[in-house]
Amino acid sequence: MRFALALLLIASPAWAWEPGPQVLGGLARGPYVEVRPDPDGASGLIRAAEEIAAPPEIVWSLLTDCALAPRLAPSLKSCRILERDPAGRWDIREQISRPGLMPRFRSVVRSDFEAPRRLRFRRTDGDLKVLEGEWRLTPVRDGRATRVVYESRAASPYAVPGSLARLVIRRDVTLAMAALKRESLARAMSPR
């Protein structure tokens, strides 16, 4: 039993990427976004980072707002909560996306929350073959700003050339990080 559990933990994705000094130094110029093929060839690995001049609680409130999600993610057309933990530790969402010129697809995702620091998500149903990852929020500048780190694996439900899929994902993630920053700054500046 212990061996099986250890094997499961080893086989599970480890979301431990931390941006290095070169990435962090470049965040003043805009978000860092990296999209590359997964070594197993079945999916793509996405890594992104951004620094936002707003406290983690503000950024968190935007990341977890299903109604706002289509404004933050360019290819997301709708987001609907199907089930929610009464204690607020998780929810299950149905999302309809239409990236670029590709047909629309449906994904059902369970998100586990460690407010306001970590949001882990994984596919539970839908068209995507693979979808799992996390958002991490780290307070910086004495809590007045937030370092946002995003890491995920995703695989298209359609036969798409890898280079085209990576191009669309890179564009969408870059736009999503910019929208998250824009909305966070607007909320941070608004009178309470």
Task: State each model region's role.
Residues 123-171, 175:
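Beta-strand/loop substructures that line and gate deep hydrophobic ligand-binding cavities in soluble
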Residues 16-85, 175:
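Hydrophobic ligand-binding cavity/cleft-lining segments
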Residues 59-60, 69, 148-150, 180:
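Hydrophobic pocket/interface hotspot
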Residues 37-43, 51, 70, 80-128, ...:
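Glycine-rich portal/gate segments that line the openings of hydrophobic small-molecule binding cavities
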Residues 1-6:
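Sec-dependent signal peptide recognition
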